[in-house]
């Protein structure tokens, strides 16, 4: 296992050989706040739309995020913050680029379907499912809880990526227009998505997946890398996925990020 302190306040451990990654968010640092400020627009709208559409300002993006966020249950809020953290951290630590956006384009709700879809340096697709939770049961073993989250992610990504809901791919195909600038790359990615599409006669059923867990627990006891590796070994032995990455984030609470986003909206409205 190698450690990496690329972002202050985050102790990052990686086992690249076994595709195991853990972010211990020990402090909601200025680095992480700056990442939210610089990346939220592109995460929410897509980098193309965030660049080309002047109405997609940071303040308006915060506003739209909070419109969806503040009416939700605590569990849904944990999920939204967990998905935001995943969007922020995976591309920072792994050489992957998101081709999907975070916002629900049709309604004032959370995104349906794939949480995030990425491409790697070879333009292979990676389907990511994020599951968050963990701060309600004070006595539950953190490793057991983390593995439960990963198992939930596995169940959902299997259902989504191998299921017949064509709208899931249709949504990502639209997102590609908002996330990729290069025309040729855009066409190549759409062709790959079409191969996985349920309406394709000779549909590809081989998937690269990322199972991401966001565990809200105090860091006096940390997710064990060895447990994560053993869990991945068991999943690999099932031969369900072509490629498999496990990416776990441990943070004490989601509230500090919530308060920061609210303060940013308030601040920009009074400037």
What are these regions (language model features)?
Residues 92-109:
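A short acidic/basic microdomain associated with nuclease active sites
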Residues 227-271:
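Charge-rich, low-complexity intrinsically disordered segments
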Residues 132-214:
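Catalytic cores of nucleic-acid endonucleases
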């Amino acid at each position: 296992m190698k450690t990496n302190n690329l972002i202050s306040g985050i102790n990052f451990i990686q086992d690249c050989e076994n595709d195991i990654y853990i972010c211990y968010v020990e402090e909601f640092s200025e680095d992480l706040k700056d990442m939210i400020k610089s990346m939220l627009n592109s995460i929410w709208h897509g980098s193309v739309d965030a660049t080309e559409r002047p109405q997609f300002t940071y303040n308006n993006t915060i506003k739209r995020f909070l419109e969806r966020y503040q009416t939700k249950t605590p569990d849904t809020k944990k999920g939204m913050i967990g998905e935001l953290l995943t969007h922020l951290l995976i591309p920072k630590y792994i050489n992957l680029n998101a081709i999907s956006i975070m916002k629900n384009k049709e309604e004032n709700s959370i995104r349906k379907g794939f949480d995030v879809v990425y491409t790697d340096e070879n333009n292979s697709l990676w389907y990511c499912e994020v599951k968050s939770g963990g701060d309600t049961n004070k006595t539950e073993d953190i490793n057991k809880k983390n593995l439960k989250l990963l198992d939930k992610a596995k169940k959902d990504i299997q259902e989504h990526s191998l299921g017949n809901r064509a709208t899931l791919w249709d949504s990502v195909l639209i997102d590609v227009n908002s996330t990729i600038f290069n025309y040729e790359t855009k066409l190549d990615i759409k062709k790959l998505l079409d191969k996985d599409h349920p309406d394709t006669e000779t549909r590809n059923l081989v998937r690269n997946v990322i199972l991401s867990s966001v565990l809200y627990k105090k860091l006096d006891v940390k997710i064990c890398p060895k447990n994560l590796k053993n869990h991945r070994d068991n999943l690999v032995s099932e031969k369900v996925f072509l490629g498999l990455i496990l990416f776990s984030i441990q943070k004490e609470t989601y509230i500090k990020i919530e308060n920061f986003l609210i303060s940013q909206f308030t601040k920009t409205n009074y400037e």
